[in-house]
Design a protein with these regions (language model features):
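A conserved mid-protein helix/loop that constitutes part of the nucleotide-sugar donor-binding site
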Residues: 1-11, 22-26
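Nucleotide-activated donor-binding/catalytic signature segment of Leloir-type glycosyltransferases, i.e.
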Residues: 24-44
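Short acidic/histidine- and often glycine-rich active-site loop of Leloir-type glycosyltransferases
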Residues: 27, 69, 82-100
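Aromatic "clamp/platform" in nucleotide-sugar-dependent glycosyltransferases that forms part
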Residues: 60
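Short hydrophobic beta-strand element within catalytic cores of glycosyltransferases
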Residues: 77-80
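A charged, aromatic-enriched C-terminal amphipathic alpha-helix characteristic of glycosyltransferases
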Residues: 110-145
Length: 145
C-alpha cells in the first residue's frame, strides 16, 4: 500500500495509521513517532476518520478506494497521488487534492471544505447508487429492443 510514502513525509501534526496487517510490527519499529491504532470498523472507524484533518492515501495501485469515500463521508479531505483509483474520485479542491508530490497534496487538502467532502460522498450512498442504477435500467431496456 506504499505506506512509507506517507510515513516519510514532513508534515505538521500527528500521523495516524488505521488498520493492521503483517507489516504492522515492523512499521511500529521503523516509525515509533507514528500512532498505529490497529483495525477499526463501523462507528469506531468513522469517528477515527473524523478526527483527521486530511486523509493521506499513498497507494499507487488501488483501482477504486472505498476508504477514500469513507474518509470523505466523515468530512475529511483526501490527499493522494494522481493514479487510477483516486483520479476517479478526488476532485481537486472539492473533496481533496492530487499531486505527484504527496506532501503538497496534503498541505493543499487542509484548505478543502469538510462539508463539501461529506456532500460528495453522499452521491455514493446506497440510496444514491440504487437510484442511479434504476435510472439507467430504462435506457438500457430501450436499447435492448
Amino acid at each position: 500500500k506504499n505506506l512509507p510514502a506517507f510515513l516519510d513525509l514532513d508534515l505538521p501534526g500527528e500521523k495516524r495509521v488505521i488498520g493492521g496487517g503483517p507489516a504492522l510490527t515492523a512499521l511500529k519499529v521503523a516509525y515509533p513517532e507514528v500512532c498505529f491504532t490497529g483495525p477499526k470498523t463501523g462507528e469506531e472507524l468513522a469517528s477515527s476518520l473524523a478526527e483527521a484533518d486530511v486523509f493521506v492515501f499513498p497507494s499507487l495501485t488501488d483501482t477504486f478506494g472505498v476508504v477514500l469515500l469513507e474518509a470523505m463521508a466523515s468530512g475529511v479531505p483526501v490527499a493522494a497521488f494522481p493514479v487510477t483509483g483516486p483520479k476517479y474520485i478526488v476532485q481537486e479542491g472539492l473533496n481533496g487534492c492530487l499531486d505527484n508530490n504527496l506532501r503538497s497534496a496534503a498541505l493543499r487538502a487542509l484548505e478543502v471544505s469538510r462539508e463539501s467532502c461529506r456532500a460528495f460522498a453522499g452521491d455514493y450512498s446506497w440510496a444514491s447508487c440504487t437510484r442511479q442504477f434504476v435510472n439507467n435500467l430504462a435506457p438500457a431496456r430501450r436499447l435492448a429492443h
